[in-house]
Amino acid sequence: MKTLYMVKYGCGQWEDYHEDIEYMYETFDDAKQKCLQLQSEVDQRLQDNKHWYDTLNKLDDENIEGIYNEVTGRTSCGVSFYEFVDSPNDFPRILGLFDDNMQEKFLLYAEAVEHVDSISIFDNEYDNPHYFMSVYEWLDDGSMKWIDAFGSEKLQEMSCLERN
């Protein structure tokens, strides 16, 4: 008999939930280290994503689209707000209609939209992307028997795998 430690990735909700085996190890410590490292990367990515969502929400609350429409409505520019924020530097004459503070907000909004648009549909806190470890016994007949599974929070507290 041999113990096998699988680091798995889980994501999604309800019928969209899926798990993938990412790594297999023969030692608890190696699997634990990899699982915690990967979860740390997910946590950092989710934190970064939240920053960009919060930035968009803050700028939306400031109604920069309304301000844009009000100012450009007095001109004949004919460029919609979303076309403008896709690449504001391509429209220097429109950008020049606004003070430096507003220009910075438009550029920040464009950057935030770019980041948010690049986020995977399953890479958000609502789909709970997470890594965990599943422990199996590889039996003499070649079959595998599931022993237990541990999330990253539980793994941080564990120094070794304890068996009953």
Locations of regions flagged by a protein language model:
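A short beta-strand micro-motif
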Residues: T3-G12
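Short glycine-rich, basic-tinged beta-strand/loop micro-motifs
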Residues: W14-D16, C77
